[in-house]
């Protein structure tokens, strides 16, 4: 009788749970059905080579080295690897964007060649005298049109191209499986599993002289990526009831961050060559945070004289501008509402 009552209660609870899952949610007063979880702040995204890039910039700045202008071309994914469910590529398609950030961290002057669609569009309109930098508020009145001047676009001295050329799965793996328990069918049993696997990814880049098309620098690097998985479980019968409890934990080194590390390492070597930097020992003589416009998030050209409060180092601060962490923003929000 007790078993039947327990079964009925479980069935009732399951029905109630399913009905709750299938019910239509009600929007809150804020207008949302659900509040997203997670409050992690936006942070810088450095690799182990980001500090070296910033050091290169400081070296060039201190020694007053005039750096060549760099353009970033197509750094494509040549691995051909795709997700099994067809949801996309295994490897990031944004390697060129990572290279732009890397050369910016090194303080290299950059000219845009990767996406010139907006500039080309406005150049076309300017050529037809349709664009003005001081538009007239009256819609039917003519205005001064933008002039196209000879030589107004700076050219590049070198450009970077290449690709992600290797993605090798499971080049090595190791693990252990253990199972132990009572020999009786209804006795306590347990299992343990541990797995470690290693894969690698490779990059090939080249630096080309824009005027002569000479390839002046070629770099090929690979990086290994490690993953691990640990799980354990217990299986038992207690008073006629079945209990199966399992727990596990796994971690995989970020694949796309490995691509960024490859690009930053290659950029360090290329930039050090262009700057004529002796080697890492030169970083000991310089403050890697000495330039207020270059940091581990990239580089910028200040629009106003406010580098004392807005600079490359403040951009690295994960609490800055965050309504949960920055007291100035929190107080402003409280005062507004």
UniProtKB/Swiss-Prot annotation:
Q: Where is the composition biased (Basic and acidic residues)?
A: 314-337
| Keyword Transcription found | yes
Q: Where is the composition biased (Polar residues)?
A: 303-313
Keyword Transcription regulation attributed: yes
InterPro entries membership: Curli_assmbl/transp-comp_CsgG, Holdfast_HfaB
> Region (Disordered): which ranges?
303-337
One annotated GO molecular function: DNA binding
Q: Which UniProt keywords apply?
A: Activator, Cell adhesion, DNA-binding, Transcription, Transcription regulation
UniProt GO cellular component terms = outer membrane-bounded periplasmic space
> Pfam family of this protein, just one?
CsgG
Q: Which residues form the signal peptide?
A: none
* Summary of the function given for this chain in its UniProt record: Required for the attachment of the holdfast to the cell. May be involved in the positive regulation of hfaC.
Q: Which NCBIfam families match?
A: holdfast_HfaB
Query: Mind telling me what this protein is named?
Result: Putative transcription activator protein HfaB
What is the organism of origin for this protein?
Answer: Caulobacter vibrioides (strain ATCC 19089 / CIP 103742 / CB 15) (Caulobacter crescentus)
* Gene that encodes it: hfaB
